[in-house]
Regions:
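C-terminal luminal/periplasmic domains and tails of membrane-associated envelope-modifying transferases
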Residues: 387-557
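Transmembrane alpha-helix segments characteristic
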Residues: 119-124, 151, 169-174, 212, ...
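Signature aromatic-anchored transmembrane alpha helix within multi-pass, membrane-resident enzymes
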Residues: 209-216, 282-294, 335-374
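Membrane-interface transmembrane helices that cradle and orient dolichyl/undecaprenyl
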Residues: 151-167, 177
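Transmembrane-helix signature of polytopic, membrane-embedded enzymes
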Residues: 71-80, 99-127, 146, 160-169
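Perimembrane helix-loop-helix junctions
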Residues: 186-212, 268-281, 342
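Interfacial juxtamembrane loops and adjacent helix segments
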Residues: 9-91, 238-239, 304
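Membrane-lumen/periplasm interface segments of multi-pass, membrane-embedded glycan/lipid transferases
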Residues: 21-50, 219, 223-278, 391-418, ...
Length: 557
């Protein structure tokens, strides 16, 4: 949203107008990163937003509305406002995906009764990445999937009712889907090939000219700003296919990124298409949809970073959702047609099939509710190990991402040593090997617990009486939450109980007798009064906050 604000204030894509530090350049394979800020690209003396510009441009009207209410991604001193950024993103993303849910409903009503149409909306909007990813923040897919969903709706309306396809509108929607997320080039190709079968020569020419016009404008934008035909993010050189088969299987069946695990309703849709293929209409459209789905799975498996970094589930496959919704509608229509052909005679399969579908739908909604609501699923990406540094975690069935916060992570194979008089700074990444579960990401002064239980693990080379000095403070809300009671256990044995009512960071010593210490130790904090700021009406934070810890240090006795 900062780029949107820059376009409003300065009519420029250069972010130099704002108080953004020019950090030492980090040479990435495809661009020059501004220090450790992957979102920013250095081009000569200028700073640009590395991610696609389409979302920022389309969001300008909404940023103007936010500005009218005093909300901005830029503070009065021209520095970045994380509060303004997240506030605008969360509201806009939720609104856009609500519009997409309406599009899904009207798509379904073209072919299905009201009840089935509502089930399609629940599955498409709540049982997919639309809820857990695209509605939570302004990802590149958020605008793109809405634009593409409208295109699919227009195509289905033509197939069912013969509704006129507006050539320039379709061309423009597809162009802007590409400007917001270049992976949608796959879907543009699929739709373009499909249109060859239904358009007249004159319509094809108009469609091609619309695409050429938008493409020319984009090349001019890129050349003016970067002296390149395409911006860095859009170049195909980012695809390497070095771990293709691992990536493809991971994108399909891994417990923390697999499409078939997070959206098992896809399996139900595939069954419908096969089982009722004789009653299936619009088979040409089905073929294009399946080809586009397969192509995107191949492309996203070509990235070295195929798991999508610190994200939830199959984020990189979000663009498949409109196709899957379309196939679901066609499959359900074929199922209903089959029933009519049999005279609506009830059989055991008649009842078993809807039950199986509803069961898979309920599981899909549960999985994506976890990603949308539980902060523990976000913390999973960094604790107990950073998934970008240990991507093997994606395959660990002992704690799938969607069960983070419900299941503790497996006990680490390696427990870091904690030398005496060595302070663990909880604001740094160096502290993370000591944190097992129940912790949030680091903040400037401390790190919050995010559940009623949180643990620290450490190993000792010498066992003797120790005192652990913990610098911490409780989460308090005047008049609503006046103290936090903290019970501390070492290796399952109670050490102390504290009543914390001082809101300032304070050092609390905890005695650790030699007879309770082991070579490998687990220190557990139980905070029964942990609560979310949102539940107490003091903010939008849904994390279950108990205490915040700044540091911990072992002192020999």
């Amino acid at each position: 949203m900062m780029l949107s604000q820059c376009l409003i204030n300065y009519r420029s894509f250069q972010l130099d107008h704002y108080a953004i530090p020019h950090l030492p350049p980090t040479l990435r394979e495809d661009y020059v990163q501004n220090g450790d800020l992957y979102q920013l690209e250095q081009v000569g003396p200028h700073l640009y937003y590395f991610l696609p510009p389409g979302s920022s441009i389309l969001s300008v009207p909404f940023v103007l509305v936010a500005n009218a209410f005093g909300i901005s991604a830029v503070k009065s001193d021209n520095s970045f406002s994380i509060e303004g950024e997240t506030g605008i993103e969360a509201s806009l993303a939720a609104f856009l995906m609500a519009v997409l849910a309406a599009v899904f409903f009207y798509m379904a009503r073209l072919m299905l009764p009201l009840g089935y149409s509502l089930l399609v909306v629940v599955g498409g909007a709540l049982g997919t990445q639309i809820w857990s990813t695209a509605s939570r923040a302004m990802f590149t897919d958020t605008w793109a999937v809405l634009l593409f969903g409208i295109v699919i709706f227009a195509v289905l309306a033509y197939e069912i009712n013969g509704t006129r396809v507006r050539v320039l509108l379709i061309g423009s929607l597809l162009a802007w889907a590409y400007f917001t997320a270049p992976v949608y080039a796959i879907h543009i190709a699929a739709i373009s090939l499909y249109l060859l079968f239904i358009f007249t020569a004159r319509q094809i020419l108009a469609y091609a000219l619309a695409g050429i016009g938008w493409a020319a404008g984009f090349v001019i934008y890129s050349w003016h700003n970067f002296s390149e035909l395409l911006p860095s993010y859009f170049r195909p050189g980012r695809l390497h296919f070095r771990a293709f088969w691992i990536a493809l299987s991971g994108n399909l069946i891994s417990p923390s990124r697999g499409l078939l695990i997070f959206v098992p309703t896809v399996l139900f849709v595939v069954y419908l298409l096969i089982r009722f293929r004789a009653q299936l209409k619009n088979k040409r459209l089905v073929a294009f949809a399946l080809a586009a789905i397969a192509a995107q799975l191949i492309v996203i498996s070509g990235f070295d970073h195929w798991w999508g970094g610190h994200s939830y589930g199959p984020r990189l496959a979000t663009g498949l959702v409109p196709w899957c919704v379309l196939l679901g509608i066609l499959g359900l229509k074929a199922m209903l047609a089959s029933r009519e052909d049999r005279g609506n005679v009830a059989t055991s399969r008649t009842f078993a099939l809807p039950f199986a579908g509803l069961l898979l739908l309920a599981f899909s909604v549960f999985v994506h509710a976890r990603g949308a609501i539980s902060s523990a699923t976000a913390v999973w990406s960094v604790l107990p190990a950073n998934v970008d540094q240990q991507p093997a975690r994606i395959w660990d069935w002992r704690q799938p991402q969607f069960l983070a916060g419900l299941l503790p992570p497996p006990f680490p194979a390696s427990v870091p040593p904690l030398p005496t008089r060595t302070r663990i700074d909880f604001t740094t990444r160096e502290a993370e090997p000591y944190l097992w579960y129940g912790w949030s990401s680091a903040e400037p002064e401390s790190r919050w617990t995010s559940a009623t239980r949180a643990t620290i693990i450490f190993s000792l080379s010498e066992i003797r009486p120790m005192a652990l000095q913990i610098k911490m403070a409780p989460f308090l809300v005047a008049g609503k939450l006046e103290e936090q009671r903290v019970s501390i256990k070492l290796n399952g044995q109670s050490m102390t109980e504290l009543s914390l009512s001082n809101p300032d960071l304070t050092i609390y010593p905890v005695l650790l007798p030699a007879n309770t210490l082991r070579k490998r130790n687990t220190l557990e904090f139980h905070i029964s009064g942990a609560a979310s700021p949102a539940s107490l009406g003091v903010g939008a934070d849904e994390r279950q906050l108990g205490i915040r810890v700044a540091s911990a240090e072992l002192i020999p006795q």
